[in-house]
């Protein structure tokens, strides 16, 4: 007879996806748990590489980083060996918040000499940085599309290959769609319904590009393209070309004179959020929940 162990989760608590500890069920915790699942299921980090609420030391301060990641071969989980730091906040905390925004993340990264990557998210906004040194010896934080996966392949961050597209898992597709929809609403000034329709156009382009076998994927935006207006316009031109094919195939949904109305900066951001996923192969129940 199989001995099945039953875990009873106390009311108001959740069981942490990585370390199994009970934590308070809060809006901030929901964001962290979603990110933890993505780290393991999509980025393929092992739970042994990840530490939750890791205490940092700089000066007299001892703040706790929400999530830190070490190399898979790291045997000493010390502050000097941290490679990635992730800060998760509830939706109401803005990235520009002086105490809990991206500046907090950058201060944590600065205190960890070998930490190259950092991510800040509140479930609606996401900011990713790679730490470096400029020609004057100053610490700089460069915007990136995403943190690297466990294999460390940076090329996949900028232009994923067809065979490397990832299936979305659990609430992550909903999480991504929500982030994109909010970005349109805030940055393009569109109300929820028009914002959804613009996002729908981009999703149709993503699926159309996935179907275009065996040609290389054209639905992508590199970190460099996202960072300047010329690159953003290049992305818009590339995606608009895909949308021309979408309109021909789905004439009952889109008019012949329809176009993607998003600001190039917003479009580049949304493309960079969606480009890593395989929407065609993602489980239908997950897609249904997200849509």
Put a short name on every predicted segment:
Residues 1-117, 125-162:
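A short, conserved, highly charged catalytic patch centered on acidic carboxylates
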Residues 8-20, 170-190, 270-275:
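Short amphipathic alpha-helical segments and their helix-coil junctions
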Residues 36-37, 198-210:
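Short, hydrophobic/amphipathic alpha-helical patches that form generic packing surfaces
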Residues 156-172, 176:
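Charged alpha-helical initiation segments
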Residues 168-172, 194, 202, 210:
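DNA-processing P-loop NTPase/helicase core
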């Amino acid at each position: 007879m199989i001995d099945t162990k039953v875990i009873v989760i106390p009311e108001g608590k959740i069981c942490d996806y990585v370390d199994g500890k009970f934590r308070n069920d809060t809006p901030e915790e929901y964001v962290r748990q979603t990110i933890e699942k993505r780290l393991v299921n999509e980025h393929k980090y092992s739970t042994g590489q990840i530490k939750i609420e890791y205490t940092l030391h700089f000066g007299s301060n001892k703040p706790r980083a929400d999530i830190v990641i070490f190399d898979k071969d790291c045997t000493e989980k010390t502050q000097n060996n941290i490679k990635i730091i992730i800060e998760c906040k509830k939706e109401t905390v803005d990235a520009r918040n002086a105490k809990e925004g991206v500046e907090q993340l950058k201060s944590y990264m600065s205190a960890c000499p070998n930490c190259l990557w950092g991510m800040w998210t509140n479930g609606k906004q996401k900011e990713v940085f790679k730490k470096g040194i400029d020609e004057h010896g100053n610490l700089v934080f460069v915007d990136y599309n995403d943190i690297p996966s466990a294999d460390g392949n940076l090329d996949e961050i900028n232009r994923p290959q067809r065979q490397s597209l990832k299936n979305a898992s659990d609430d992550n597709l909903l999480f991504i769609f929500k982030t994109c929809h909010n970005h349109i609403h805030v940055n393009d000034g569109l109300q929820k319904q028009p914002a959804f329709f613009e996002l729908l156009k981009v999703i149709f382009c993503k699926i159309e590009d996935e179907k275009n076998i065996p040609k290389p994927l054209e639905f992508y935006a590199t970190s460099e393209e996202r960072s300047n207006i010329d690159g953003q316009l290049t992305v818009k031109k590339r995606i608009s070309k895909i949308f021309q094919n979408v309109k021909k195939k789905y004439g009952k949904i889109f008019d012949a004179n329809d176009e993607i109305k998003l600001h190039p900066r917003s479009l580049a951001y949304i493309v960079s959020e969606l480009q890593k996923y395989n929407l065609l192969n993602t489980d239908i129940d997950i897609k249904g929940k997200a849509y």
